[in-house]
């Protein structure tokens, strides 16, 4: 026996995490990532934008999921021949960095930061934003994601910031920017406004209970209604009401001190309710809710008037804080007032409500906003100065009760927006801000969105499309510190107004005569100059305090990373838009949105052409992953336990890539199952090949010419799988791609290898044996390349092993790190050190034998169904059965594989029939969910008819109760006649098999012989014998086995490479049970 080995010694029980660590070393030592880019120089590019994360926190499972998806398509496009640059990037500015710094410095609020010093604060932010960069690199590298960290862009870099300035000025020059004091979502905890889309990020709405109150406002003019309605209302004590009071309902009592108007619905019916000669005005539909407060019995009749008649009436202010405010304290009609909750009357505080501001401005009422940046009342409300608005509610309610304006207090449960950084409830507050006129070009955004391929596809017109249709102007300025400063300088003297907007560092340097080394505050704030429009020379141009919304910077990533237009103009034109981006679904309100806003406004182009919106990862109970809940494991721990390929497969083969949720358990059972059910079968096929190829001292080659029917079948299945993976990944569908891999290895292991064992085991090294090795080798090498993006490290390990590189020595390759391998795509010699440097296989010289595949798949179906019947009847596979009857219209094809069927399911005879009607009938199975929606009124009759078999098929389809059913509304299921046992359907429910389950004594004896063979093979394995070792066997039994040995002894010896003997010193002894009888088995290696 030769000692020549062409392949590593591969263990069946392998530590995949250890293998991955070796692969990572191999990639690093051989610079494989950079080679994968360099060797595609001159090829067309696949443009990929890497959305920048913040580096002031550790990566979580969501980051890993996004990273896995990015890596799959980058690797895939590389093996498809594209050049794929993968430049990493960091988000550096904004609230995440500032909040972290405030926490670390022990300060809070704008005043505290100013006192601390803006320069020192921003220096701390600059240092803190990158504090986890090394950990990020560790996580990203360990997950086998290839990115260029060394050339990473940062939004805090001067060049990136300058591109942001350019974008701002471009928008300004196009008339797409304006400054305004508008009501916006406002985080009092962060002391900054938020964009409307930021309140939609990460499900920032929380259930909250607030006090909703109803208050009465006294009308000033009480004569309007008296003469008209006093008699109808049955008043007492005279012909006049003493007072008219209009009732308003609000969930924000703290806004009442800033009330300046009331709004009613023009067409809403309002009831005039008499209580003790006071007329209360309330929507007629809401009267019943206030019966107790208004002393009503439910039998009263009310005078009804339309809301339009109330317009223009004035009322007495609840408080005297703004009693002299011009044009205020009147009732106005508006179409945003609706019936339902409350009283049908809305109180207007234009400083705290967007609709309020719009209505009041249209009536000449200037807003008031007596709340400061930290959400506390200012001195304009002296009774509440310094009180946080939510803490003021009870104080306001008490005062209203004392004044006689209070009617009712309720506990109101509603979904309320919270700050996405601090999780504190937002308020709506008027703040000065710069806005992008998104409403001016939103229709164009909707048009450009149609050019984007969204995954899932419904995002285009639903989640994202509807968001674009309702887009609002975007507030892009923030009164914060750590960010790109708005390049706007204003005159400090309103008598000589002037605004200068700068779009480059050069422009700033020219006007201010200084060298700009840092664009951040406070350095940029210190740049001042005399106002050129002031003839007195006294007014000064000063920069406004605001910085950019960090989302503006994220949306500037395509040109910011290139320092466009100051550098790399040609590069940018060639790399815009992106071919592909990916993030989780909430980014339709974040990065995806800001990208398309700026891309449309600046370039009139979509920013990307393909976009995956994946779902979110939750714990096993459906809760968000949280450090506080301790409901997830550190990803690095899972990598060390199961490897990162297993986590990659777990995530990307699930519905999370289609925008749905993925529930993952803390202990990693789901990942272990992936390892066991997906990755281990791949390794098992590789292990089988190496162990037998080494035993035979044979080397496999890429060869697709074998005429063996099993070889042709598995090579056809291989090409089908390779094509399916390619089609799936071309369509950004990893789920289907992983299924194609799993399905192929299921057939390879459990059909091809098992059915070809005799070819691998036989002694002769003939052409048939070599063809078997070549075929299995071709399957393994081709699939490692095809699936290299899906399981990059296991693919690399197998690929290297197939090229005679020991797994533990991957970082010690010879020939200057290169191996000569055959490329299955071209048939030429390529110098590839890695599977990731190969070209995607096409198998262009091999034609799929579709007829063989169809027939063999039916054979496989017959065998698997037969084995299932055995399992359900508790008949072991080693027990022979008399026959199987196959009832099909395609028996002629099946007859060619009769011996295979007999051997696989262990039967003596195969009987073929085509008279299906004598064995089974068609049963109608209805799809109630679909059919019930179309024909709800006929469902009972259709169900009854289906049970009675009162239906028929025609050229038009299936007809029942006079209705023609659609193909997705029913199935015709083959159902055996009740007296027939041991049956199963196959060939898409059009054929039937019947397994004869009766056991004769001869069949039972042969079954025992096969059991003995299994016991001996198990003993060989436990004794650690080689598969080629010949052995001695002795069997000592409690019952007589002589007849079995006499009839099947030669068969037993052939299958086990053994000879029967007695009185020898065994290497291994075992005791086993055969049909409840004890057998002692002794074996010895010869």
UniProtKB/Swiss-Prot annotation:
Catalyzes the attachment of isoleucine to tRNA(Ile). As IleRS can inadvertently accommodate and process structurally similar amino acids such as valine, to avoid such errors it has two additional distinct tRNA(Ile)-dependent editing activities. One activity is designated as 'pretransfer' editing and involves the hydrolysis of activated Val-AMP. The other activity is designated 'posttransfer' editing and involves deacylation of mischarged Val-tRNA(Ile). Its EC number is 6.1.1.5. The keyword Protein biosynthesis applies. Belongs to the class-I aminoacyl-tRNA synthetase family. IleS type 2 subfamily. It is found in: Cytoplasm. Monomer. One of its GO terms (cellular component) is cytoplasm. A motif ('KMSKS' region) lies at residues 624-628. This is Isoleucine--tRNA ligase. It holds the Pfam family DUF5915. GO terms for molecular function: aminoacyl-tRNA deacylase activity; ATP binding; isoleucine-tRNA ligase activity; tRNA binding; zinc ion binding. GO terms for biological process: isoleucyl-tRNA aminoacylation. Keywords: Aminoacyl-tRNA synthetase, ATP-binding, Cytoplasm, Ligase, Metal-binding, Nucleotide-binding, Protein biosynthesis, Zinc. IleRS has two distinct active sites: one for aminoacylation and one for editing. The misactivated valine is translocated from the active site to the editing site, which sterically excludes the correctly activated isoleucine. The single editing site contains two valyl binding pockets, one specific for each substrate (Val-AMP or Val-tRNA(Ile)). ATP binds at residue 627. A motif ('HIGH' region) lies at residues 53-63. Its cofactor is Zn(2+). It catalyses: tRNA(Ile) + L-isoleucine + ATP = L-isoleucyl-tRNA(Ile) + AMP + diphosphate. The keyword Protein biosynthesis applies.
